[in-house]
Amino acid sequence: MKQSMHLIVRGAIAAAAFALASGSALAASNLQVVDSHSVSLFTAAGGAFGSGSAISPTLWEVKYDSNTFLAFCLDPHVAVSNSSNSYSSGAFAASDSVKRLYEGYYASSIATVSTSANSAAAFQLALWELNNDNTNLLTGDLRFKNLSNAVVSQANTMLGVATGNGAIQNLYNYTSLTSVNPASQTLLAVSPVPEAQTWAMLVAGLGLLGFMARRRKGASALT
């Protein structure tokens, strides 16, 4: 649990710093895979982006623009390439269903990856469904004959919440990482939105800095 919490805190802090730098698109920068958390390959017998494709939903830990953070895949048809690692970043317009998925399950899904990747894998399946398919794991391009697999069953539960009518709290900022070469998959990273109290402290701090600067300038003019 200590290792899991360390991963969450480290990822959250790095992603928060990364998000502050990503209010607008950044120039292409090198992306390096630091670690990955996935389940064993299993087959979507009904057809996963092709009849009987073997898939392994994965949570990635990556280093980009001097920051290390966690990211999920947005493009299920493309693998992460070790040779095509030049990426650009920009704000991602998350749908309401994707926001509900993150607000309901992101924190808990990444909390257990050091001991089990099942929740993270289920989260990845749900994200693929919401962003690329028809939100139904029994039909569409990504489909299964049944929901008996533990990861698929958990993903189905997540989809039920994500496509529901739950209130959206806008807890995260969303940033997409897109490979300059389309041969490598697009990734999605998030960072917590600072609470109102945090913003108030930041504004107050900036105001104090401005006041001190004006005071020093005034003192210089008198001497």
Feature annotation, model-predicted:
Residues K2-S29, A183-A213:
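Short, threonine-centered small-residue motifs that mark membrane-proximal processing/anchoring sites
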Residues A28-V190:
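Short, surface-exposed polybasic-aromatic patches that bind anionic ligands, especially phosphate groups
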